[in-house]
Amino acid sequence: MLVLFETSVGYAIFKVLNEKKLQEVDSLWKEFETPEKANKIVKLKHFEKFQDTAEALAAFTALMEGKINKQLKKVLKKIVKEAHEPLAVADAKLGGVIKEKLNLSCIHSPVVNELMRGIRSQMDGLIPGVEPREMAAMCLGLAHSLSRYRLKFSADKVDTMIVQAISLLDDLDKELNNYIMRCREWYGWHFPELGKIISDNLTYCKCLQKVGDRKNYASAKLSELLPEEVEAEVKAAAEISMGTEVSEEDICNILHLCTQVIEISEYRTQLYEYLQNRMMAIAPNVTVMVGELVGARLIAHAGSLLNLAKHAASTVQILGAEKALFRALKSRRDTPKYGLIYHASLVGQTSPKHKGKISRMLAAKTVLAIRYDAFGEDSSSAMGVENRAKLEARLRTLEDRGIRKISGTGKALAKTEKYEHKSEVKTYDPSGDSTLPTCSKKRKIEQVDKEDEITEKKAKKAKIKVKVEEEEEEEKVAEEEETSVKKKKKKGKKKHIKEEPLSEEEPCTSTAIASPEKKKKKKKKRDNED
């Protein structure tokens, strides 16, 4: 049986001399305690040495992926096929590939693993012609090269640095806000007017660090930090400040907090520049499309640039809005149109009605840029610049769609109404004051004429009745002299007679005119009786 043993120096093929001892797996390690004992079990048949580390790296990457290298294929065809013996391999996947392509019987078992372990322990004595120093140097170089290959390592392409940098940048922003708020509240007890005069946080902390107590503002020179007008205003406010007095220990603690704020803000600017440079080195096209901050947040959200490249455009569009997405799906409402990509400059400068369209188009182009940066060999940002120019042109067409110029026959079709200045004097309509519902019905001309005739007839009848009533009243007045009881009854009848024509007929003007005449006649009769 032959044994294929891979080393960092080259391929070694051993011949098993005593196969009976392989049956005792538990005691096989005793046979490899010394080089002499090991030479009695296995013997080197062929050794194929690598020329350099690059060749060794290519061979081992092929073995890791379960593939056969060209160099290994030549060795197996030359040595193993001629021997017509089974081949022991350390990897079952590699054995399957060898059997498929070269038609060689391969063995992989716990016995083979124990045999490989014994050969590895006595490798210096079993492989002559290779110095231990050379073996150690090749092992170290191959280990570094293999690690770089497996981790996709590159000095310029480390997306882990971007993930950590953007996370630290967000943490620094939160800490700075907390520290600045605490500093303003703390020093506000001593000099509250300063917070209203100086709005910039960093300038505020620098002024505190330079002056300290409120009494020192009169003699302090703040021309390096503030304009002349603001400096004069600060000094004037310090003289008439309504703040309380504080001790020197309080001022020392406030100043120490100010130094912390200044140092953190300076480190934040340095970290932001580092992030910009790292993004331009790793993902230049993504940086051009969405900016360094949004691009870094997308990479951090996905975990790495390779993971982000595996996402679809629709996923990248709503990346960062997972809570809103699942909430919308649960409540069966409209899903969100954008996530982290909303903070890109192209989406921000768009009108609200076009934000959804632009975010969808930007996500599609950003995915192309991500995949180009992740898998492309070229590190230029030409593709990103070209796609951004297309998106900006598309954005201009969307914004100017309603303001297009009319040319040709369109001018004749587009009729514009003439402008007329209406300066008519309007009167107040009191009919709108009533809250009662009014329903105005139009009447026909014939009906109006008939109604006029009826009213005229009623008026004539009313005049005749008034004359009759006057005559009857005269007779009744004469009868009133006999008895007072009869007079009262007659008076009741008079009232009854007066009310009947009013209830039956329409209101007329003649009755209203006749009533004062009746009263005069009654008075005359009463005077005559007396």
Swiss-Prot record:
Compositionally biased intervals (Acidic residues): 469-482
The question of whether Phosphoprotein is a record keyword is answered with yes
Site of the Glycyl lysine isopeptide (Lys-Gly) (interchain with G-Cter in SUMO) crosslink?
K467, K498
Q: Give the UniProt entry's GO cellular component terms.
A: box C/D methylation guide snoRNP complex; nucleolus; nucleoplasm; small-subunit processome
- Residues bearing PTM Phosphoserine: S109, S304, S351, S484, S503, S515
Region (Disordered) location? 409-530
Q: Where is this cross-link: Glycyl lysine isopeptide (Lys-Gly) (interchain with G-Cter in SUMO2)?
A: K157, K353, K411, K415, K422, K426, K441, K444, K465, K467, K486, K498
Q: Where is this cross-link: Glycyl lysine isopeptide (Lys-Gly) (interchain with G-Cter in SUMO1)?
A: K467
Q: Which residues, by range, are in coiled-coil regions?
A: none
Q: Which UniProt keywords apply?
A: Isopeptide bond, Nucleus, Phosphoprotein, Ribonucleoprotein, Ribosome biogenesis, Ubl conjugation
InterPro entries per the UniProt record, alphabetical: Nop56/Nop58, NOP58/56_N, Nop_C, Nop_dom, Nop_dom_sf, NOSIC
Molecular function (GO) terms for this protein are: snoRNA binding
Q: What is its main location?
A: nucleus
Modifications made to the protein after synthesis:
Sumoylation is essential for high-affinity binding to snoRNAs.
Where does the record place Basic residues bias? 486-496, 518-530
Where does the record place it? Nucleus, Nucleolus; Nucleus, Nucleoplasm
Location of Phosphothreonine modifications: T34
Composition-biased stretches, type Basic and acidic residues, lie in: 414-427
UniProt lists the family membership as follows: Belongs to the NOP5/NOP56 family.
Functional note: Required for the biogenesis of box C/D snoRNAs such as U3, U8 and U14 snoRNAs. Part of the small subunit (SSU) processome, first precursor of the small eukaryotic ribosomal subunit. During the assembly of the SSU processome in the nucleolus, many ribosome biogenesis factors, an RNA chaperone and ribosomal proteins associate with the nascent pre-rRNA and work in concert to generate RNA folding, modifications, rearrangements and cleavage as well as targeted degradation of pre-ribosomal RNA by the RNA exosome.
On subunit structure and binding partners, the annotation says: Core component of box C/D small nucleolar ribonucleoprotein (snoRNP) particles; the core proteins SNU13, NOP56, NOP58 and FBL or FBLL1 assemble stepwise onto the snoRNA. Interacts with NOLC1/Nopp140. Interacts with NOPCHAP1, NUFIP1, RUVBL1 and RUVBL2; NOPCHAP1 bridges the association of NOP58 with RUVBL1:RUVBL2 and NUFIP1. Interacts with PIH1D1. Part of the small subunit (SSU) processome, composed of more than 70 proteins and the RNA chaperone small nucleolar RNA (snoRNA) U3.
What name has this protein been given in UniProt?
Nucleolar protein 58
